[in-house]
Amino acid sequence: MAMWPQSGMLTTGGRAGMQSAALAAWVANTKPGAQVFYLGPDYEMGRSTVAAFKAAAEGKGAKSVGELFAPLDNKDYSPFFGQIRSGKPNVIYTSVAGNDTVRLFSQMAEFGISRSVQVVGASGTVTGQNLAAIGKAAEGFVTGAGYSTLIDSPENKKFVAAFKAENKTDPDLYGADSYGVLFFYKAAVEKAKSTDTDKVRAAMRDLK
């Protein structure tokens, strides 16, 4: 749970800083002193997600060897590949998402960019919605997502089965987060024994 005291806002969803810290720790353990090239989409979320991971990674000894931001709905990533190769990274971090990920990963595989480089990225980069379209080009990709359908617990297995029965697809990170918000609110109401806003807010602060 994350909280912004000034506004009284609480959230059950993972934040870029949390996910970046976990992913940066993994990179530090597997690629000590990593040479990282950053490639993101050119808008606020893309840039802020890159910045969050960059700060976490450099805090653990990684070094930046380049940074590029592509326009949204970019069709051709090959013009960026020369600069990526020149940087000689052993890790590429990307915050590209959606259909852009399909094109990026397919083109990185086609041009041999991802053959000898570890590709890591934001939680929304490879999801259940675009994984089939990306196919084998997604193999080896690592992210710091806060949810997976593969979590081995009775609660998650029950959730995945119920979600799939209702929606005909597995839950992704956003489906799990949405469920988490409702479950969190329900638990707070039960703890407060009330739906009064102030009482529920107070109960939320103590929930684990």
Language-model features: locations:
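Extracytosolic ligand-binding ectodomains
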Residues: 1-208
